[in-house]
Amino acid sequence: MMSEKFALVLLVACIAFIGIETSPINSDSWKDGFCGENEAYDSMRRGCEKRCDDHNPTFCFKFTTVCWCEKGYVRDKSDTCIKVEDCPNVSENLEFSETIIGM
């Protein structure tokens, strides 16, 4: 009898957990503070982000990024978004591009 109750409680807990994990979030308020400084949340975007040490990325291993540097910012060696002009050894005429992977 005790093991049946335990199994039932465990089953209900698992179903509740799955429901929470798969339910859509109706409010965008959770995004506030989710990303770091100079970053913006974008769950639909895929590709290689601009970096100080790679101004023309062609391939990257990170495909599920949801926090992207805001326009005019790139990632430095510590993965912080900084202004393009603050990158070390960057000429003023250097253009940064990014590779976007289609859905």
From Swiss-Prot:
<protein>
    <recommendedName>
        <fullName>Probable protease inhibitor Egf0.4a</fullName>
    </recommendedName>
</protein>
<dbReference type="InterPro" id="IPR002919">
    <property type="entry name" value="TIL_dom"/>
</dbReference>
<keyword id="KW-0732">Signal</keyword>
<dbReference type="Pfam" id="PF01826">
    <property type="entry name" value="TIL"/>
</dbReference>
<dbReference type="InterPro" id="IPR036084">
    <property type="entry name" value="Ser_inhib-like_sf"/>
</dbReference>
<feature type="domain" description="TIL">
    <location>
        <begin position="35"/>
        <end position="87"/>
    </location>
</feature>
<feature type="signal peptide">
    <location>
        <begin position="1"/>
        <end position="22"/>
    </location>
</feature>
<comment type="similarity">
    <text>Belongs to the polydnaviridae EGF-like motif protein family.</text>
</comment>
